[in-house]
From Swiss-Prot:
Keyword rRNA processing carried by entry: yes
Gene responsible for this protein: rlmE
The protein's name: Ribosomal RNA large subunit methyltransferase E
Lineage: Bacteria, Pseudomonadati, Pseudomonadota, Alphaproteobacteria, Rickettsiales
Family: Belongs to the class I-like SAM-binding methyltransferase superfamily. RNA methyltransferase RlmE family.
Annotated organism of origin: Rickettsia peacockii (strain Rustic)
Catalytic residues (UniProt): K183
Transmembrane annotation, as ranges: none
EC number: 2.1.1.166
Function: Specifically methylates the uridine in position 2552 of 23S rRNA at the 2'-O position of the ribose in the fully assembled 50S ribosomal subunit.
Compartments where found: Cytoplasm
GO cellular component, one term: cytoplasm
Catalytic reaction equation(s): uridine(2552) in 23S rRNA + S-adenosyl-L-methionine = 2'-O-methyluridine(2552) in 23S rRNA + S-adenosyl-L-homocysteine + H(+)
Source superkingdom: Bacteria
Amino acid sequence: MTNNLSGYRNKFVRVKTSKKRTVSSSNWLRRQLNDPYVAKARIDGFRSRAAYKLLEIHEKFKLFIPNMKIVDLGAAPGGWSQVASKLIKASDNNLNNKIISIDVLEIEHVAGVEFVQKDFFEADTEELIIQALDGRADIVMSDMASNTIGHKATDHIRTLLLCEQAFEFALKVLKPSGHFIAKIFRGGAENELLHKVKREFKTVKHFKPSSSRSESTEIYLVALNKK
């Protein structure tokens, strides 16, 4: 199971204060050093702890099967693309599987993944992804989040806007019965988006993986079977 952390919990590491390091960066470093999922990801060969969130989503909803076309929005550093590649048994020589990953930041090659290095919000990006897909997608997934500033309401709205953009794109490229997965932060303003999603998908669920930090307001919107 992805939440089995036996052997990954280390002795608590304290982070010394530094004049060059802000309080927020010190807190982030402390969390990273003491996070068992970070240690587990390093050992398991995943590029980020976020890989376990997608694994848990799959364990719950059984979304990924071989011979799929998948779009991974905001893919860097590639943890979700790695998981999708493993679950659908993708390879560079298997044309029946296709994963299109996009991010403004470069990511190292993942087997069976075609990487598009562009800003998702640039005018021509959607058309580039559609051309690369060469058909309709089975899954559109987004772990995109805005750079947080520590103000919960602002962070909530900014990440919600990213989710809305991903949702609008998903409607354009998903095949009937396709699925949409996206991160949102709880904060109250998400209800309008949820109503829109429910009109377009047969089943819409909220899911908070155990690998999501307990103090975080993040949850995942899992929309199943596009109408």
